[in-house]
Amino acid sequence: MSENKNSEAEDVFEFLDSLPEAKNGGKMVNTDVKGSQEGVKGGSNSVAGKTGNDGKKGDDDIFEFLEELEKSNLSLTDKKGVEKKAPSESVNNKAQDEKVEESKENKNSEQDAHGKEKEPQQQEKEEEEEEEEEEEEEEEETPLHDPIASISNWWSSSGSAKVSSIWNKTAEQASQIKNRLAQEQLDLTSKINTSTITEIARNLQKIVVGETEEVLRIHLVHDLVNYPSLQYNIESKFDQVLSSQVEGGIRIFVDEWGHPNNNGITPVEKKPSVADGELGNSKKKLQFNLFDGKVTDGEKLAFANLENAVKLFNTAHEEYQKQQKEADATPDDDRSSISSNSNKISDLFISILPIAIPQKQKDADGDFQVTDSNTPGNFNFTLVLKDITNDITTITRSQGFPVKWVNWLEGSVEKTGSTASEERNKSYDQKKQKESEDEDEDDEIIDPSEWVKEWIEDGLSLSFGVMAQNYVIDRMGL
């Protein structure tokens, strides 16, 4: 309690010191506040020991001063019309206010002490926050990079120059390549001559022959016209026999020499392929060009045709060899390879001749038909094969076919041995026609050539197969 009283007294004295000096009876009254403060402090420390005159004087001065204040306050309240409290109450209020201020100051001092401890941490936080705010402001201030604008800037500055330089380099390289290719083309054309052409042909020959052990070149000699499947039938029959009975690869090439009876070789009329159909399917009629006479005479004619074709082939082959010798650009190794390859190529000539035996005079009533290759009124195919490479010759005759079949296929009048028989047959046919005129008018027209053409083709194909088999047997020496 003593401490609280002392603090209140000190507060009062401090307040009094802050007031201006008052006049007392025309004299300035100077209250010795410090002395009174010391007296009060001394009284608080030793209340019973210190009761001097200085303390009384100080108290009197204070009371006088308070009275003056009260008077002044009363005068002010009279003017304003407001009642004022007693000076003691005002002093107490002021003391309470001073206490509140002191408590606030104490709290503030404590807060300042705690705040001083927290100041460095708060400063660091504030600095970090300020830095973050500055960075955010910088990010907001810095604009986003526009890719189109950057590309346009690059193109306007250095990109166009780089692209133009690259374009110029590529154009120069393209022109250089073009000039070089043109020069190489000129050099290539200058290097090509007859020797290179012959070398290419020789290499092609090596390729064709090298893939197989032997090549059969079959040359057909005949007078048949509009026979579409002749080459196919011969090639298929030879391939059938050789592939099943001979080891190693053998290739077969078939060509036609045309009409050897004429002076020189004339090109054969173009025939349709096998896909076009069998005999007689073309617009033009099939022509066999039969030889009427003895079989021996027909064989002589077939051999003559064959020999003529061989001579023509030999002359053409000799001219080819002369051209190779004139080139004279083949080394010894190539010549030896050519000679070895030529031994693997075999040239075969096949002559095809249909021979018809003339029909003798006979009675019409006792007629009966005989189908045979040696019987009059029939024909057969005589096939003569000659291998000029291996020196092999064979003769094959087909089965007999009626001559009237040829007449149906060719669309001509039936051929007989004498004019008398022709007249007799005509009169006999006329009688039959008159008797059956009424019946034939209603009947449909029949084409017998459609019946017989397949049998002729099958018989000729069978003869080709027999000829191929005989050739293989002769090659094997059996």
UniProtKB/Swiss-Prot annotation:
Pfam families assigned to the protein according to its UniProt record, in alphabetical order: DUF5427
Subcellular location: Cytoplasm; Cytoplasmic vesicle, COPI-coated vesicle
Disordered, as annotated region: 1-153, 321-341, 416-448
Chain intervals with Acidic residues compositional bias: 125-141, 436-447
Keywords from the UniProt entry: Cytoplasm, Cytoplasmic vesicle, Phosphoprotein
Domain of life: Eukaryota
Chain positions with Phosphoserine modification: S273, S436
Bias (Basic and acidic residues): 77-87, 95-124, 321-336, 421-435
Cystines in this chain: none
Chief localization: cytoplasm
GO annotations of cellular component type: COPI-coated vesicle; cytoplasm; Golgi apparatus; mitochondrion
Quaternary structure, from the entry: Interacts with ribosomes.
Function of the molecule: Involved in telomere capping.
Other observations noted: Present with 2160 molecules/cell in log phase SD medium.
Entry similarity comment: Belongs to the MTC1 family.
Protein name: Maintenance of telomere capping protein 1
Gene expressing this chain: MTC1
